[in-house]
Amino acid sequence: MKETPKKVLVIGSGPIKIAEAAEFDYSGSQALKALKEEGIETVLVNSNVATVQTSKKFADKLYMLPVVWWAVEKVIEKERPDGIMIGFGGQTALNVGVDLHKKGVLQKYGVKVLGTQIDGIEKALSREKFRETMIENNLPVPPSLSARSEEEAIKNAKIVGYPVMVRVSFNLGGRGSMVAWTEEDLKKNIRRALSQSYIGEVLIEKYLYHWIELEYEVMRDKKGNSSVIACIENLDPMGVHTGESTVVAPCQTLDNLEYQNMRTYTIEVARSINLIGECNVQFALNPRGYEYYIIETNPRMSRSSALASKATGYPLAYVSAKLALGYELHEVINKVSGRTCACFEPSLDYIVTKIPRWDLSKFENVDQSLATEMMSVGEVMSIGRSFEESLQKAVRMLDIGEPGVVGGKIYEAKMSKVEALKYLKERRPYWFLYVAKAFKEGATIDEVYEVTGISKFFLNKIKGLVDFYETLKILKEIDEETLKLAKKLGFSDEQISKALNKSTQYVRKIRDQSNIIPVVKLIDTLAGEWPSVTNYMYLTYNGTEDDLEFSQGNKLLIVGAGGFRIGVSVEFDWSVVSLMEAASKYFDEVAVLNYNPETVSTDWDIARKLYFDEINVERVLDLIKKEKFRYVATFSGGQIGNSIAKELEENGVRLLGTSGSSVDIAENREKFSKLLDKLGISQPNWVSATSLEEIKKFVNEVGFPVLVRPSYVLSGSSMKIAYSEEELYEYVRRATEISPKYPVVISKYIENAIEAEVDGVSDGNRVLGITLEHVEEAGVHSGDATMSIPFRKLSENSVNKMRENVLSLARELNIKGPFNVQFVVKDNTPHIIELNLRASRSMPFSSKAKGINLINEAMKAIFNGLDFSEDYYEPPSKYWAVKSPQFSWSQLRGTYPFLGPEMKSTGEAASFGVTFYDALLKSWLSSIPNRIPNKNGIALVYGDKNLDYLKDTAVNLVKFGLTVYSISELPLQGIETIDKTKAEELVRAKKVEIVVTDGYLKKFDYNIRRTAVDYNIPVILNGRLGYEVSKAFLDYDSLTFFEISEYGGGI
């Protein structure tokens, strides 16, 4: 019999970090929907302001608080839920659940854990308990021993035998894990590994070099009924984290015996931890015989379960929530197919490929090799009817400037076979591009296998693409059959045109004349074997007819955000989903085009139609030809939509909202700067970098520092502050590489200025605007800045000038829809530095802070005009809201943590408060690993910028009860100093509670900053923020814990 609790508390995952991303927005949203269907009151704790999940329609009550046990206890005390779900918020939620159990909070308030119980979670996540459980159940695990100290680890590694894999218990993204080939390797890194475990435990395991890694996803109900939903094959071998791996589903190289044996083991693993809901089980398979080991299991929704859900069309999170309530598998209907029960195991008539996306170029000193720790910030998922088609589509989806596996920058680069094989041995990201290059330069299958361990099945497929492309290159014209084969192999019009040395228009014209067009296929989870109703589609050239008839009417296509990267994350998915809902009032049919498996926008029940496919001009034109969309919306999905807006308009596509020509003016630094001059709007002095002589002349006039800004980029890509001629020329070179078609603008960098922004909506005549103020000074990228609503330090006079400037731009560019304007304010004079004619990164925050959905208002503005009489309207603030960045320094091996004009954060958290400091502290504490320092501990405060703020920070921390040291090489007046060597020793000994620093000091303090983040010690990288946070520590006892509506926020 199923349980029906009256009120359930759902724990979210907090801000996005590497290895814990938007998949938990998707899974948490589905869990909340499943609970709502049962008439259960829901309470959500999640500080991630950017998510769809933290909108009021999902949970009955929302608490935007740090996802830590003591904050959740306050909610439990107030709300008194009957049950708690901890399996839908990643490792963060599981850790909170275990803490609440161990501290007796759940028992005290009579709160029942729904789904897999705490003892099952501990069996799965403690490496030692998992190993013991597998052995007790006669399930195969690699030779291994656990350790809780450096000495024990070294002793056990000798017993197991080198090389060893060090796995970390209760851990996220493989943080701290490693392969140690020698005792010296182990000694060097074992302390970090132990520091990254929530329970201080590691497993020393025999390293299975070049074994195949596989994952199975399994559902299990309270009666023990199980369904295996997917088998996912990692192309990268053991030793590369699964989140870093290119994967395919269904698995391609297993024979039936291997598949069935591991399927049986998967069900046994689920039984051994008494799973109720969903888990994934990871296996290692010896490529030379029938030998396999169980590696680990995650007893919760995970990144791979989100992928499996989107790959198969099976709603894992929804079903898992129903099972947690006590339903049996046969009682739950698969909402995607609409006809089958959840006990049906999916069958696929297509191949899915997932590729991670890295942004390592943004980080100094970062280790570029793929290994046991996850470093990718996003992923893409493609669907095709051959491996080649699926892989090539996925490469284009990465949006890294490569047209497919072959024919791009790496393929045509000057690189020898030896160099290509060297890159492969080093396991660089996007290895398949180097595989293709190696084959082009004459490498054999065996040579590539030797350095990569990638199955020869896949290597042969990539070699086939190389051979075909090289054949294409010697053709003068292309015949119909060859063109058809090229499209079936996943070649884009751009790739084909490059091979033939023709234009893409030429290739498209031949395709149209020959009627070589893609067909639309449905994903129904059953490979067409069973009747189903579905709205989940992809395009392929490996088919003869469409699976559906296309409707007529007033239709809209919304372009999604694609794969996440630094600067494009879940906040843009919030905008896409908000637009879907708002647009349904104005259109007969709304479809979305996106390919990110982590998101809510790619869920089956959000859009009327979901096209899981590429976002580029070729694919959008294909869809318009079939669907006859009246409008295409490119403004909600971040930079990717804006990048194709102008070309779509040139091809006759009607864009919803602001015109492509206006977008081009805003995105082109030179055109935009000239427009500001024309309107008499103040901006920092600038020059377009057309020649080095011009740059020299400009710098001689304005002096250093200057800012180097490329065009058409997001997250400040290659945006740098240059303090010398040498830096300037290097930064100009890089900026020209990243955006070669557009001019680079050099502008004067205004020091010690306040940075502020306006998120807004316009109908071309009036503006609805929300002002945000940064805590850090101008020069820190807005995505890395701490923001407050309302503003604090800006004068009313400055804000009124900002509003006048915004209104002038809205009217001049005829802005219709959402926008964001960034200012630096010095001596009460605002200077515009940027205009984005799209939904912005901060829009979920500003919307939720003011209680007004700017995307809804954007649709009103486009179709009906804004409904207020003033030229410019800003809704009043009832309380304070503060947004803080989440950095993932600890995942990015070796990188130097510092802040500048190029974005480095991976996520954001926000909180509300009755004072600025109430909101600030809860927001800052929401980002991992931030915490309140233990009194009587040590703080390090030093730097070469914002010295007055650093000194006041130190004074506040002394008042709070810490012993504060500055560093003798960078002394602060009145603060006790120690030398750098002593400071490094204190950090390594984990005696330091917090580090507050400012400036770029890599040659001086690399070891301090790096060791601090490796050991999970909070680090504040800006003196102004350090001052405000240290002041907030003094008011720690007066934090408030209200539901979002009580602060007047939420939408």
Swiss-Prot record:
Q: Where does Mg(2+) 1 bind?
A: Q282, E296
- What positions does the domain ATP-grasp occupy? 131-325, 673-863
What ranges does the record give for the region Allosteric domain, renumbered to this chain?
931-1051
Tell me the segments the record calls region Carbamoyl phosphate synthetic domain. Answer: 549-930
Q: Where is the MGS-like domain?
A: 930-1051
Cite the InterPro entries for this sequence.
ATP-grasp, ATP_grasp_subdomain_1, CarbamoylP_synth_lsu, CarbamoylP_synth_lsu_oligo, CarbamoylP_synth_lsu_oligo_sf, CbamoylP_synth_lsu-like_ATP-bd, CbamoylP_synth_lsu_CPSase_dom, MGS-like_dom
- Sites binding Mg(2+) 3 sit at Q822, E834
> Which parts of the sequence bind Mn(2+) 3?
Q822, E834
Q: Which GO terms describe its molecular function?
A: ATP binding; carbamoyl-phosphate synthase (ammonia) activity; carbamoyl-phosphate synthase (glutamine-hydrolyzing) activity; metal ion binding
Binding positions (Mn(2+) 1): Q282, E296
* Stretches for region Carboxyphosphate synthetic domain: 1-399
User: Cross-referenced Gene3D superfamilies, in alphabetical order?
Assistant: 3.40.50.20, ATP-grasp fold, A domain, ATP-grasp fold, B domain, Carbamoyl-phosphate synthetase, large subunit oligomerisation domain
Q: So where does Mg(2+) 2 get bound?
A: E296, N298
List the catalytic activities from the record.
Answer: hydrogencarbonate + L-glutamine + 2 ATP + H2O = carbamoyl phosphate + L-glutamate + 2 ADP + phosphate + 2 H(+)
Q: Assembly and partners?
A: Composed of two chains; the small (or glutamine) chain promotes the hydrolysis of glutamine to ammonia, which is used by the large (or ammonia) chain to synthesize carbamoyl phosphate. Tetramer of heterodimers (alpha,beta)4.
Protein name per its UniProtKB record: Carbamoyl phosphate synthase large chain
What is this protein's gene name? Answer: carB
